[in-house]
A protein has these predicted regions:
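Helicase-associated low-complexity regulatory tails and linkers flanking the ATPase motor
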Residues: 1-279, 284-482
Length: 482
């Protein structure tokens, strides 16, 4: 119910790739195809994934590609972990930034890991410097003017704004070229006055790390970098320069103490409109065991192989009574799910993974619905359960005779039905022996149709007819005085 759970609206956002992004994407797509062919050749179709990329290159390219800054810094030369002696899960720890302690251990013990981290920092710092140089030249029209135009003249419709012939800053064009997805997320954030949750499968590079770079250029700042804000004594009445423009993180690459403080500040009732912390960013590790309050927007940066994970992430922002600080009319959550598409309709990694996840999820849902429909308490909780999905509780086709219920279907004991029908299941019931006699007769099925002749038991005192084999009351004989 709305007073307990916020209502949700899911928006599936298809974003066409820019020409440069598609060029880099195709480059990595060809690399993945060659690696996959080599893997199949080496293992002859057997299980083996030692060189499989799991579409990591193209998945990351759907989020962001580095611009062509120099011969050494460009999209095609994006650093990749060529790490020897590490297991797949350890490589993923580095790529996705899952565990701070384990990541630091790998950096200290493996020189390849250290070199990879070093190269990624060079790329990111060079990219930031590249954007700053562009920003310096946007003297008369900046990216802040783009946001004002978007909010004032286009009723916060990004498609209309982007397709318009209005002037746009050079910084906007460059950032959009590298990541239309990041730009769409940030512009959607400006559409809500409440707090926002952003989820990505990646923490480093094309995940949250570069998204933070984008947000910095739009005026956002890390909660822990704001020297004006006193985190131990938050005052709703005090206005600071970065109010409504702070973000925080909650994932395995953040210290536990910092994570705890970030979550507490974000969930404060005084922060329901994002005054102290507007955006919280989480990863797969952060999605487990965290409940967020008063969230108005959820942004799913990319699809995942398993739809259950995405549903769990969305569930972090849609918990029981977690929007009670907001007025009833504001207890609404917009879910944005992004995927990149090509203009030639050739599927991208986002499209492929979403398709696989939906197929698996449809199979799972069909099984879950069957369990719900057959559940003993289906009718009891039907009104609440059907708020999420519609289904029909299992019922026997035949109507119970004399409007009496049927015995427990999960036990194949005829006695259960008989006890319910004859009243023996009652607390103070008694067994009364009656005298019946065997008769032959037919049943009236409708006004003009009768059954074939069968034997029945007949009680002369009550006129009740009983089934010959089951002793089950099936009808009653009435005498017509006419």
């Amino acid at each position: 119910t709305p007073d307990k759970f916020a209502t949700k609206t899911i928006h599936y956002i298809k974003i066409p790739m820019e020409n440069y992004q598609e060029e880099i994407y195709t480059y990595f797509e060809n690399i993945e195809e060659k690696k996959e062919k080599l893997r199949l050749k080496m293992f002859r179709g057997k299980i083996g994934d030692s060189i499989s990329t799991y579409s990591a290159y193209t998945r990351q390219s759907c989020n962001f590609v580095f611009p062509n800054i120099s011969d050494k810094i460009n999209g095609e030369l994006r650093p990749r972990p060529t790490i020897t002696g590490l297991k797949d899960n350890e490589i993923n720890t580095i790529i996705e930034g899952k565990n701070l302690t384990k990541q630091n251990t790998l950096i200290k013990t493996n020189k390849d890991v250290l070199e990879y981290i070093k190269q990624t920092k060079i790329f990111i710092n060079t990219f930031i410097l590249h954007l700053k140089n562009i920003l310096k030249n946007d003297i008369n029209y900046s990216i802040i003017d783009d946001v004002k135009n978007f909010r004032t003249n286009y009723n916060s419709s990004f498609t209309e704004f982007y397709n318009s012939t209005d002037q746009k800053s050079n910084l906007f064009n460059e950032m959009y070229k590298c990541s239309p997805k990041f730009i769409r997320i940030i512009f959607n954030i400006f559409k809500t006055k409440g707090t926002v949750m952003i989820y990505s499968n990646y923490v480093n590079m094309e995940g949250l790390q570069l998204l933070k770079v984008y947000m910095n250029f739009f005026g956002f700042i890390d909660l822990n970098d704001d020297q004006e804000l006193n985190k131990t004594n938050l005052d709703i009445k005090t206005n600071l320069s970065k109010d409504g423009f702070r973000f925080c993180e909650f994932h395995g690459a953040i210290d536990k103490t910092v994570r705890k403080i970030n979550k507490e500040i974000f969930n404060k009732s005084e922060n329901k409109y994002g005054k102290f912390c507007k955006v919280i960013m989480i990863s797969p590790a952060g999605a487990e065991g965290i409940n967020l309050s008063n969230v108005r927007q959820v942004h799913i940066l990319e699809p995942y192989w398993n739809e259950v994970r995405i549903e769990q992430v969305i569930g972090r922002a849609l918990r029981f009574c977690q929007h009670q600080d907001l007025p009833l009319e504001e207890r609404k959550v917009d879910i944005f799910r992004y995927k990149m598409v090509r203009l030639n309709n050739k599927p991208t990694a986002d499209v492929k993974i979403e398709g696989i996840a939906r197929k698996k999820n449809n199979l799972l849902l069909s099984f879950i619905d069957a369990v719900k429909e057959a559940a003993i308490d289906c009718e009891l909780f039907k009104a609440h359960n059907m708020m999420g999905s519609k289904y029909t509780c299992f019922q026997f086709n035949e109507e119970s005779l004399f409007e009496k219920p049927i015995g427990c279907a999960y036990q194949s004991k005829l006695e259960n039905d008989q006890k319910i029908d004859n009243g023996l299941n009652a607390k103070d019931s008694n067994i009364l022996h009656i005298r019946v006699r065997k008769i032959k007769g037919v049943l009236l099925i409708n006004d003009h149709t009768y059954s074939s002749e069968n034997y029945y038991w007949f009680n002369d005192n009550t006129g009740i007819i009983y089934d010959y084999e089951l002793d089950y009351p099936i009808g009653q004989v009435f005498k017509n005085d006419d």
